[in-house]
Amino acid sequence: MDISKQLQLEFSLKPWQVENTLKLIDDGNTIPFIARYRKEATGSLDDQLLRELSDRLTYLRNLEEQKEKIIAAITEQEKMTDEIAQSIQNAKTMTELEDIYRPFRPKRKTRASVAKALGLQPLADAIYAQEKGTPAPELLAQEYITDEVPDVDSALQGAKDIIAELVSDDANGRKLIRYAVNSNGVITSKGADDDLGVYEMYKEYSEPVKSIAGHRVLAINRGEKEGKLKVGIDFDKTIATDLLFNLHCKNNTKATDLVIEAIDDSYSRLIFPSIEREIRNELTDKACEASIKVFGENTKQLLMQPPVKGNVTIGLDPGYRTGCKVAVISETGKVLDTGVIYPAPPHNKIDEAKKIITSLVKKYNVKMFAIGNGTATHETEVFASELIKELDCGISYMVVSEAGASVYSASKLAAEEFPQFDVSLRSAVSIARRLQDPLAELVKIDPKAIGVGQYQHDMPQKELSAALDGVVEACVNSVGVDLNTASPQLLGRVAGVTSAIAKNIVAFREENGSFTSRSQLKKVAKLGPKAFEQCAGFLRVAESKNVLDNTAVHPESYDAAKELLKVCSVTEADIRSGNITKLQAQVQSIGTSALAQRLDIGEPTLIDIVSELSKPGRDPRDELPKPLLRTDVMGMEDLKAGMELKGTVRNVIDFGAFVDIGVHQDGLVHISQITNRYIKHPSDVLKVGDIVTVWVLNVDVDKKRISLTMKNPNK
């Protein structure tokens, strides 16, 4: 297989795009670097497409490697033919390849292998040939009676076992049946327990294999795993056996009757159970792939939430018996103070808690409260909103997801960062910092622990981790990282920076003071020329005398950027002050094509340079809608059908989205209630962090369920 041509076809790309991209990947370049700084070579492929192409490249190379192994194995058995070799070369998937190799694979003990060991292969061959004029099978079988094969029936049964395995091993037959089951099969589930709980809807359930939704596949799988459901695929057996008869029945002889019996046995005992397993595995793989994609998109939106900058913030980690942990964080994330208050039951020390928080607010000029969304959140919200009204000094609050905060606070990393604080106070610090800069704080946590997906614990963990790591890497490099303030964890997500290099950067910073230029990176231990090439453009040095060091312009393009300023009669001082009207006017006047030729760079690179010079130090997150901040609190009992509310999308899943509307319980907007037009998936319209207008459909206080709609009931 020509892998380059295959990728061109699958991704609808030009030959030069694929060839250049493969070379860049093989040369050890990172995806963020290729996406950002090699646009001319790739035709401006984005990082998501590059990751998909890279994953597919790995699969196809593994496929070719497997082909070589199978060819070697069959050749060693001296069974290779031109036809088999051609079939192997034409195989497009691992499944096709396994079907071809099945007859040659070393087998464990089977009924067919036992029959072969008894010398019944020639009898099976004679029966399978179904030649006219051949003696009846019963007569042929008499020649094979021995001490181990006591009678004709035993001989014929052994022959049928051999034929059954031959039919099962036929790649063409399996391909046809697999297609038929995929097209006409039905997934069924039945209750295996009186108490089905959340699986009640699957008690007597069926849905076509070809159309079953991924989230239902995963739900059924989980129900089966928990012993609540019995799951299988229903399929009309006659469709399959007719296909097999057409392939294996040659003449209408007495031997044909035995071949038909062998086919029937082969399908029921060998083929269908195997294909049923394969198809269910394929459905699960597709469902997991889709779920991982949703998880990745949700994680991306969570990481890319706009930071609430420039405010001293109090982080509140709510609790009942152990109290509410308090941490005061400066505008730059430094811990100023900590404590514990007890405004919730069983203590109810509300007045004492108000005095403590009021004192902290006045002492540090606090402007924001960040409240964790765990135990006792509602009581803490009520307490905070009452205090905000009493203080009347412009404070607002936001409930922050504390998913993963406990994992982080108990980690070795948190202990190194805050050795003086106990685990609970570290959580309060993390909650406050999540409001100030979600990306910088959340990179410290395993993205699987952030909890914005569905069935994440049922996913193949290796694939989930790889996908989420890619998402985190893409987000970090999209935003850029301040070289002088970033934690080792944030630095370690920058393209080309390993965890060891990240620690060395921090050590260099501590030993020599703040970086004053990007070029100083070259002095960091283990950060060689390749690593510098990959990471430099994503690291910012706001303190540098060179304005380009605080942009995403790569050092390799500095000469071109400076020449651009010269051509446009613009100074670095103009760029620092935001006086960019002349730059934009000159670029428009000369034209990007002519200007790119004059500077000897590609147009995409020129466009990126102009964009960066127009907004040095820009944060792409600042262009997104700001988080929804609150000053008052509601309870579920305050909600009424038809009530209009503003909310924040917290999670997007296959069947809808969960929206935080300011009560302790998130409400569900079912996919059918998102818009009046047809959508394939909620993510077509919504993403995590979106601020949306919703209307209450129904509230069930006992079950803690809130149904919402985004369709205006008044229209």
Please provide the spans of the model-predicted regions.
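Long, highly charged, low-complexity intrinsically disordered interaction regions
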Residues: I3, D55, N62-K79, Q89, ...
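Duplex nucleic acid-engaging cores and interfaces of nucleic-acid transaction enzymes
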Residues: L49-R51, Y59, L63-A73, Q77-G315, ...
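Structured, non-catalytic alpha/beta "coupling" segments that mediate domain-domain communication
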Residues: A73, S87, I100-Y101, G223-T238, ...
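A glycine-rich phosphate-binding loop feature that marks nucleotide/adenosyl-phosphate handling sites
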Residues: Y179-V186, L316-Y320, G374-A376, V400-V407, ...
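Single-stranded RNA-binding regions, centering on S1/OB-family and related RNA-binding modules
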Residues: S544-K545, D549-K715
